[in-house]
Amino acid sequence: MEAMAASTSLPDPGDFDRNVPRICGVCGDRATGFHFNAMTCEGCKGFFRRSMKRKALFTCPFNGDCRITKDNRRHCQACRLKRCVDIGMMKEFILTDEEVQRKREMIMKRKEEEALKDSLRPKLSEEQQHIIAILLDAHHKTYDPTYADFRDFRPPIRADVSTGSYSPRPTLSFSGDSSSNSDLYTPSLDMMEPASFSTMDLNEEGSDDPSVTLDLSPLSMLPHLADLVSYSIQKVIGFAKMIPGFRDLTSDDQIVLLKSSAIEVIMLRSNQSFTLDDMSWDCGSQDYKYDITDVSRAGHTLELIEPLIKFQVGLKKLNLHEEEHVLLMAICIVSPDRPGVQDAKLVEAIQDRLSNTLQTYIRCRHPPPGSHQLYAKMIQKLADLRSLNEEHSKQYRSLSFQPENSMKLTPLVLEVFGNEIS
């Protein structure tokens, strides 16, 4: 047979397409990989090893150029060995018996170590996987990444008080689905009595009735952002109701937890739309892109805005998985140390279940380096939220004390955050 070009260099496995069948360079059978510096089948690999170890001397009974195939490779050992050498197989690559034994022991040890490591590696239990699945579903049902409902709020008015001008705002439309929109707006908020939180049956679809007026005051964004916060409270209520164990609490404890955590969870939720590029909350269109000026136009000062932005930046940089994000929101809501909680032990038991799930998830699913101290950093964010909550309450009390501001808020906002006007 014609001699093929011999190769004595180590081929690069990357040069071979994994989808192309690999052929033994000796006999044409299906190759299993590179053996002793050449692509061969298991049969020719074993033949070459045995021949080299025995230092066998073969003689061709014919003229020394037999064509070696899968079917006749046993007929002429001399030409088969010659073919092995021609394609680049080298005896220097053959391990001694001692080396083979050491290699086998190393492989066995590595397998045992991997098995031990795998047995010690934390795994999410079925219950924990179920908790995560429920919370993800709850979040998807209560957070619309298209922000389509924002067009139903009172319009965002970015007023220039010095000139009396205002920026363009979206055209209001109240024509939509009557089942969802007909009760959302009435001509005047003065006609409304603030609804009792306890009588709302924790209904995330509860209605708020803001008035639609053109506001050129320094607080021109207050009506729009009040509607946004009211809408977010409804969604937080909906999310909380689906937290495993939350419905086991008394109605009083549910209300206490929701009232005390609402603004914190809203701040957590808003991180999904927060952008590091320009430190703003991007909710779809330019009209619904909010910056610190917009927050100040709703009556808040830098004492709240600066730590809020710092919090948003820090949380964004943690690069949380969605699973971690929803668990953090649930842990935030179900906090046994909230003032007024009656059955703190039950609340703590629910929170512990959520916290353990979060810790296990981080160890199982969040690869380093992002997972380093991640749980501790997330818990610190909850502490930061408490401080933000306190400052928000202080500024809200000051804001809502003025009747002209209080009347721009919604009944749900007044009920959750308090009504300073008696």
UniProtKB/Swiss-Prot annotation:
InterPro entries: DBD_VDR, NHR-like_dom_sf, Nucl_hrmn_rcpt_lig-bd, Nuclear_hormone_rcpt_NR1, Nuclear_hrmn_rcpt, VitD_rcpt, Znf_hrmn_rcpt, Znf_NHR/GATA
Region (Hinge): 97-126
GO cellular component: chromatin; cytosol; nucleoplasm; receptor complex; RNA polymerase II transcription regulator complex
Major site of localization recorded for this protein: nucleus
Reported modifications of this chain: Ubiquitinated by UBR5, leading to its degradation: UBR5 specifically recognizes and binds ligand-bound VDR when it is not associated with coactivators (NCOAs). In presence of NCOAs, the UBR5-degron is not accessible, preventing its ubiquitination and degradation.
Segments for region (Interaction with coactivator LXXLL motif): 241-259
Entry's family note: Belongs to the nuclear hormone receptor family. NR1 subfamily.
Subunit relationships: Homodimer in the absence of bound vitamin D3. Heterodimer with RXRA after vitamin D3 binding. Interacts with MED1, NCOA1, NCOA2, NCOA3 and NCOA6 coactivators, leading to a strong increase of transcription of target genes. Interacts with the corepressor NCOR1. Interacts with SNW1. Interacts with IRX4, the interaction does not affect its transactivation activity. Interacts with CRY1. Interacts with CRY2 in a ligand-dependent manner.
Known role: Nuclear receptor for calcitriol, the active form of vitamin D3 which mediates the action of this vitamin on cells. Enters the nucleus upon vitamin D3 binding where it forms heterodimers with the retinoid X receptor/RXR. The VDR-RXR heterodimers bind to specific response elements on DNA and activate the transcription of vitamin D3-responsive target genes. Plays a central role in calcium homeostasis. Also functions as a receptor for the secondary bile acid lithocholic acid (LCA) and its metabolites.
Protein's name according to its UniProt entry: Vitamin D3 receptor
Record lineage: Eukaryota, Metazoa, Chordata, Craniata, Vertebrata
